[in-house]
Amino acid sequence: MFQEPLTRARHVARWVAFAIVVGVISGLLSAAFIESLTWSTNTRVDNSWFIWTLPIAGLIVGASYHYLGRGLERGSNLLIDEIHSHSEWVPFRIAPLVFMTSVISHLAGGSTGREGAALQIAAGATDPISKRLGLNPGDRSLMLITAIAGGFGSIAGVPIAGAVFALEVQRVGRIRYEALVPAFVASFVGHAVVRGLGVNYTIYPQIPDVTWSPTIAWQISLFGLVAGLIALTFVRLTQFIRGLMKKHVAWYPARPLIGGIILLVLITACGWRDYQGFSFPLMLSAMNGATSGHFEVKLLLTAITIGTGFVGGEVIPLLTTGALAGATFGSFVGGNIAVFAIVGAVAVLAGATNTPLACALIGIELFGGGGAMLFAVACVAAYATSGHTGIYHAQKVSAHKSGEVTS
């Protein structure tokens, strides 16, 4: 009579224990990573000459992957591939490799982020545990999803969205509910560890109060569709640059070296220093109602940075791109610029990652629940127009956005 409930309870307890371990590891590594990137950003800002190291930084990053991490340049796509295929273990060396090269990329001034790197660091530190425990392929997939949740929730300060992101990101059109409990536990534990260590997250402005009306409904819906096209443009441009480098530059270390030279020329010649790194000041300025930034510049520099092989991630640059695009759109339609900037940040991210639920939750956790309806509408609209291939090209398509189920 009680055999089945007891078996289920033991199964859940086992995964809760695994998730706590993953969450603690993820939180500790994310805390160190946040502090390191804060140092690298402050050092670059205080010493403007660091921009001249972009080419040599690119060479170091490329050589590190070529000689120490061949095959690991797939980044977060490696993790998603392994969730589906179980063909190879995520090696531990990816954690220090991504950590080091991300810090170098930010120190020199590449337009990159941190969330993608944090996922790889967490997975690199935890997948060897799965190997040591002898987990079967199905359980190992759950552990990788748990690591993604722990990494995202702890690095971004969004424990609910971090868990949902991990459940949503590996397949377009399907959520892995079997990983629900460990994903939430790991994400919340990782976030708690970072908080407990006294590491500060970026403080974002809260979305202004908006009265829902037919006017705001069509404006947000239209902008969501535009945000999806912006996301699609970023994805296609990054893929084009990556393909161009692969076709014409055989020696991998030369790719980020060339990327560094291009970035150096563009940034210095055009006066685009504000678009280096995370570009938090530009993002926050837009979210406070300013229209001084150009989203197309951030999009271009990020596509070059990532496409040529620098390391870090796309999430925060996409938030910045979306915020700047939202401010421009809000000004054009005569709307509240701050509202459109905040909504734009999560909408462009939703389109680029194919994770509309997680991105709507990111909006709620970072910018306040008062914008829940706006975030939901914009993220769904962006998801609809951004295509099936996002920044994580290893995503499987379980259901087309037209509604057709494939698997």
Can you annotate each of these PLM segments?
Residues 1-407:
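Alpha-helical transmembrane segments and immediately membrane-proximal extracytoplasmic
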